[in-house]
Regions:
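Active-site acidic/histidine proton-transfer and metal-coordination neighborhood
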Residues: 1-80
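Conserved, mostly hydrophobic/aromatic
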Residues: 2, 47, 83, 113, ...
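Active-site beta-loop-alpha junctions enriched in small/polar residues
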Residues: 5-7, 52-54, 85-89, 115-120, ...
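Gly/Pro-rich active-site loop or hairpin
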Residues: 20-23, 29, 95-153
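Generic structural signal for well-ordered alpha-helices
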Residues: 32-40, 66-73, 102, 143-150, ...
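Distinct, well-ordered alpha-helical segments
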Residues: 58-74, 90-103, 170-172
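Conserved active-site loop/cleft motifs that coordinate metal ions or position small ligands
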Residues: 157-163
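C-terminal helical cap(s) of enzyme catalytic domains, especially alpha/beta-barrels
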Residues: 169-192
Length: 196
């Protein structure tokens, strides 16, 4: 299994040190589908496409991210990697409801979940800006969205990303332990609901 972000980082031979968002429209959809088909055919394996964290959006978008990801997966057969921290970061940065995003996300296509911590800054208008920095503990709001996801999906392999300002091992293990506890609790609740 391998994954890639729904993003771009180069143009005309110039490479950028970030993952940049795409306009969510038919033209971009066709381009992304061609690339995913090529990759999956060449490697003879299924790609998991990850939702990005975004800091800007395009006026040329005529569908939202969930619609766009669902359309890509439907036409390519790729799976999805749900980065719950990215959902929260983007929801704060763009003012959308993260819980509603999770409720619409096609969890039946998710092969892996990512959790991480974010950094907080200010945008040009002194508004709150979150950065997917992978350098802090998972925030309470992200844990809540993780619970919400698992309540719909059941257990899904989960990775905690922490590659900046890495703390001592015990703190990382505590984050992993909390993810396991939540995964088991939500699986138990889900099984009880099904049995009732």
């Amino acid at each position: 299994m391998f994954s890639e972000h729904l993003a771009w980082s180069s143009h005309d031979g110039v490479y950028f040190n970030d993952l940049l968002p795409l306009p969510y429209n038919a033209e971009t959809l066709d381009c992304v589908i061609r690339h995913i088909d090529e990759v999956q055919h060449t490697l003879n394996t299924r790609l998991l496409l990850e939702n990005p964290s975004t800091y800007v959006s395009f006026g040329a978008s005529d569908m939202d991210e969930v619609e766009f990801l669902r359309a890509i997966a439907g036409r390519t057969g790729c799976g999805l990697l749900l980065d719950v921290n990215n959902v929260y970061v983007s929801s704060v940065n763009h003012g959308f409801d993260a819980a509603a995003y999770i409720d619409r996300f096609p969890v039946e296509l998710v092969g892996e979940i990512h959790l991480a911590g974010f950094a907080e800054d200010q945008d040009a208008d002194a508004g709150r800006l979150l950065i997917d920095a992978h350098g802090a503990p998972v925030a309470d709001a992200v844990w809540s969205l993780y619970r919400r996801t698992l309540a719909r999906s059941g257990p899904i392999p989960t990775l905690i990303e922490w590659d900046n300002d890495v703390p001592d091992f015990a703190k990382v293990v505590a984050e992993v332990s909390l993810a396991r506890v939540i995964l088991v609790e939500e699986a138990t609740r889900r099984n009880r609901r099904r049995a009732a």
